[in-house]
Amino acid sequence: MTETDQTPDTAPEAAPEVAPIVSDDLAPLRAKTIVLVGLMGVGKSSVGRRLANVLGLPFRDADNEVEAAAGRSISEIFAELGEPAFRDGERRVIARLLDEPPHVLATGGGAFVNAETRALINEKAVSVWLKADVELLARRVSRKDNRPLVRGKDPVKVLTELAEARYPAYAEAQVHVETGDTPHMVAVEAILTALRQAHA
């Protein structure tokens, strides 16, 4: 048999063995926007980008979208307009994003606390609470100076207070995932497993 003879026999069979398995496995997870919620430093943006890549979905970061809409950074919005103005802009931006085709959306730590936003997310998307120990989150956020809520303060104290205030709202997320101090792709696999179980 010549090389030319072999090509028609083997090539058509190779693709169906792999592609449909991946497609069928992940297709249900692509049907709705996946919204990541949780405290600052838990990895919503970094893990979210990788999750979007695995699913073949666009990635959106609500904080970046708020900055683009306001024409200034989150820190500037907090300093010049105050937190209430930021939260109002955040709510409107998330509502707009939820009307877009399915994507992975990373939200700010306080977004899901807003009852209106929380209800809208749970209605139009799949909400995923990423959770990790406060001490771990404090170590992460202390490495950067771009978090207005912890700048110049004890991050453990701030995050502990935020956890007490926000966890009841986060608990209303449809999927809960403990991420811990793991590589980003391990967290992605944990999210995918939890999403599959939720769709089962």
Swiss-Prot record:
Pathway: Metabolic intermediate biosynthesis; chorismate biosynthesis; chorismate from D-erythrose 4-phosphate and phosphoenolpyruvate: step 5/7. It is an enzyme of class 2 (transferase). It is found in: Cytoplasm. It catalyses: shikimate + ATP = 3-phosphoshikimate + ADP + H(+). GO terms for biological process: amino acid biosynthetic process; aromatic amino acid family biosynthetic process; chorismate biosynthetic process. Its cofactor is Mg(2+). The keyword Iron does not apply. Catalyzes the specific phosphorylation of the 3-hydroxyl group of shikimic acid using ATP as a cosubstrate. Monomer. This is Shikimate kinase. It comes from Caulobacter vibrioides (strain NA1000 / CB15N).
